[in-house]
Amino acid sequence: MTQHEDNALKLLSILLLVLLPLSAQALQRGDRLAPWTLLDQYDQPYTLNDQAQTLLVARSMDAAKLLKTALEGKPKGFLEARHTVFVADIQKMPLIIATMFAIPKMRDYSYRVILDRESRVVPQYPGDEDKILWLQLRDGKVVDQQQFGDAQALRSALEKPQM
């Protein structure tokens, strides 16, 4: 092997190692979601399991507001009755704001908010910063995914019977 071929092989190896993590983030139909445990707004633990049929993911406050708007007027337990879990990444929120204002306010919501306080879980799932990622699950595996940037469209999707 020549020096040029050896350098090209090393470069290719490094390139593959750099790009491999990027491709691992894209979820494909049939991928099993790794279980995780986070606390909700009441400091109660929730572990993602095979009972969840829909996972809603918010990467920002704007995305979380979409869900809040979509659920206006819905009864307490609406998401749970649909085996739907909502996880919000709040790592970017200053701790004092989260602790003193945001999380106490979330306790008045009619739905459970699983809080990703350290961005441990949400970054595993692809999606736009300002949209809600919807992962449709069956037995812990992804069967469909879509994003919502409109509260009314999200509300309509949530109102449809789940399969």
Predicted stretch roles:
Residues 48-65:
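Short active-site neighborhood of thiol/selenol oxidoreductases, capturing the structured segment around
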Residues 85-87, 102-129:
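Short, internal strand/loop/helix patches
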Residues 21-23:
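N-terminal signal peptide c-region/cleavage motif recognized by signal peptidases
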Residues 35-52:
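A short beta-strand-turn-helix
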Residues 63-105:
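Structural microenvironment flanking redox-active thiols in thiol-disulfide oxidoreductases
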Residues 151-163:
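A short, polar/charged loop-to-alpha-helix boundary motif
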Residues 49-50, 117-153:
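Thiol/disulfide oxidoreductase modules built on the thioredoxin-like
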Residues 2-13:
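Bacterial N-terminal signal peptides that target proteins for export
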